[in-house]
Amino acid sequence: MSKGPKFCPTPNSPDIFDLKIAVKDLTRKLELQKHFENSPSNTEDDPLKIKSNYVPPQSSDMVFNTKIKEIKKTAENIQPVRPTHYNITAGERNAITSLQNNKDIIVKTADKGSSFIIMDTSYYKSKVEERLNLTDLYKTHEKNPDNIVMNRLNTFINKHKSILTKKEKLYLKNPNYKTSNFVAYPKIHKSKFIAEKVQNSNSNYIQMPIPPDLKFRFIHAGPCSPTNKLSELLDSLLKPYLPKIPSYIKDYNDFLNKLPNYEKNEMDDILFATCDIVDMYSNIEVDLVIKSVTYWICKFPTLLHSRFNLDFIIEGLGIVLKNATFQFNNKFYSLQCGTGTGTQVAPTIANLVMGYLEITLYEKVKIIFDENIQKYVIQNWKRFIDDGQICWKNSFGDFNKFLEILNELHPKIKFTSESSEEEISFLNILLYKGKSQIETDIYYKKTDTHDYLPYSSSHPRHTKNNVPTTLARMICQIVSDEEIREKRLHELKHWLLKSGYKSEVILNCFQKFENVDCKDLRNKVISENEEEKIVFIQLHNPNNPQIFGKIKNIFNSLKEYEGVEGTFSNTSLIKAEKQPLNLGRLLQKSFFSMEPRLPHGVKKCQYKKCDACKYIPETNVVNFKGHHKLFLIKNHFDCNAKNVIYKISCMGCDEFYIGETVNLKQRISGHKHKLLSEESDVQKIYNHISFCAKNCNIPFTIVPFYQVKEESLTARLTIEEYFIKKYNPKLNTYFYEKPNFSNKKRKLDE
């Protein structure tokens, strides 16, 4: 665990499915570019940039089709390479498994840090339940309220169907949603007890009793929650308003570029001050959000996307903010007031709310101080979400008066403050008084252990080689004094060497910033290459066969055949690798339950009104007719299973069909409906079942048997194709008799 949460152990075995998915995804990209080569570009302004699942028909270019087949063959008959050496020992691999299975402890990463925190499960549970027992903030539910939320969401979508495109409506309906989890992350950087213990320790870890001043950051909305797709849309529509807020800063570099310049004789008059909003998200009420967003949209109406209006935004925000639901320890909750801290639009609306309140701040400063000080505050009060900073001039009067104004902006929005005549930290920057100007240095929290990504981690090499570059650039952007900059780079080199980076790699990265002024780095705009790129995306796994070289040779031969006027003449093929599971994802789980883990296999959901339960047999193995070996199910499934491969069996003869689905319950409903339909293009299958199983009370059963990790149609179709070829289901063969398999297949599974 001393390697840090970002460290990736070498995967145990080759991932052949990943390679097949990567190749299928690449050939689809090539086919799309070929298909649309003579079509005008789509100029429709799509605020969500929704990805399409469209699969183009086969090209009439025979050479192109041959090259596509050659690329597809690289993923066939793949033989695993011999496993490479692991980057952790067998004992460490066993320790990971032991930690995963230990129910007496819970592992979390620190809030704003790179450290692991191990706590007693009972302590973590008590701290979370202490929070959830605040009845003014949270409400308990006897059963999962997500279905109610989805009904409200669908009503909203239908009401505004004239505004939304077809793709947007399908996207917002979010069929792959999951119940959010309530999670708490320890704020160890806020604990004086922990900071003191870390500073006095030379070990890779510290062990101590529970510090009485340890606080937590609570997250109660997830990236897959029912309303998160709507939250994404609202976020994209509201973000253009953020630069209109005078105090808004995007990141530390934006803050550096907006740092005021003072004359030498003004330096003694400066007081550095920072202000932090206490529990901001919990105290931003929905009514305040509506007022704030309405103000900004009405003030800058041209910034709103032309297809959308204020009513859509306001009603949409109500759906997102008033329906934040989540679970903890098998109990269901909803947020009663405030803003969900995990929903995507939360930081944007927090900025808009504070920007709205700051209009009152400026007016009160003018009344209590004067107009010149008001102009100064508008120009120099800067805020990163809930953290504010100002270089206050003592000649203006008592800074506490300014703090009082801040704390009177809203009854629930309260600020704490720190100030200093000499220096102060803000974000990752230390501000201090130089001889003639404000100087900046990089700031590390007292609990920062400088455990950067170890070079032994199973990351792509270019990712690891870029770590020193990124860290060195940050130092050279922030540190204004050249001598201190050299000192900070020397410290960084020491820490990187401890993490396994080679000296020559570090120095090569550092040389990129030699003799470059920090102001030039802050203002540097990265130019983009105009050449189009098609990206081959695969999981980084040293155990996987390396097929990209073969694919690139085939692609280059295609370009050579087409010549300078060809479809791909200005296109390059590059490889991007996703990182495997890191220690953070292996050791910490969002889902929390004191109950025993659900066993592998298929179970009915037992919901009284569920129409799907009767079609799902309870089992932990799958029997494929004609195959003697049983398939062992390695996940827990019920009627609500999502993103799965399933088997549908005729109850009359046990012949079967293999399919894929995003939502099993909806798929069962679709199959049941098509048994009664006379207009289906794939009626042969349903004719078979309705005739063969006519004397059966239940004509077919469905068993989900494989969980697809990647939530994409390409992944599901690739793995479905693998199982179809492996088990040769008779009911699937109806499709092979038809020329346009993909379209018929899609009609069955829609």
What positions do the PLM features span?
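Charged structural interfaces that engage phosphate-rich ligands
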Residues: M1-E750
